[in-house]
Amino acid sequence: MAELDPANPCFGCGGGNPRGMRLAFELDEANRRVIGQFRLGPEYQGATGFIHGGIIATVLDEVMSKVSRFSNVRAVTAELTVEYLRPVRVDEDLCVEGHSISRNGRVLYHEGEIRNAAGTVLARGRGRFVIIDPERYNRKNQATADTNATSSSADTRARS
């Protein structure tokens, strides 16, 4: 599995988010697939004993977003559709896999599945991702970080 980036604040795959899921994925270059193996604990449950649907959607979004790496582009989720086929149990061994369906200009279409250890498909997702300019993204990201830092220091002064 890939190492988590300790500076990445992403809830799904970042190593820099103490409350995040810390999902790690492998790029299967030969088959142009992204694969992750994991277990989701009780902190991610909705109904007792079962994983919350929003968490399932997050896992599918994460694996499908990583598929964009095969095109050497940075893309963001524009649309995500999830089919919940079977309940996902807490502490169950799971495999998530994502692959590309097609591309139309700046738009990428990806698919993902979550399976249990027996190979049963528990959830399936389809996503539409839009390619973005990484330099523009980084500039906006830095501006947001600067604004948040200014707001945070103002909040600290106000509480003093």
Map each language-model feature to its residues.
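Hydrophobic beta-strand-centered segment that forms part of the acyl-chain substrate-binding groove
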Residues: V63-C95, S100
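Residue-level recognition of well-ordered beta-strand positions that form the cores
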Residues: Q37-R39, T81-E83, E97-H99, E113, ...
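Hydrophobic core residues within well-ordered beta-strands of beta-rich domains
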Residues: R32-V34, V76-A78, L94, L108, ...
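Short beta-strand micro-motifs enriched in acidic
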Residues: E26-D28, H99-R103
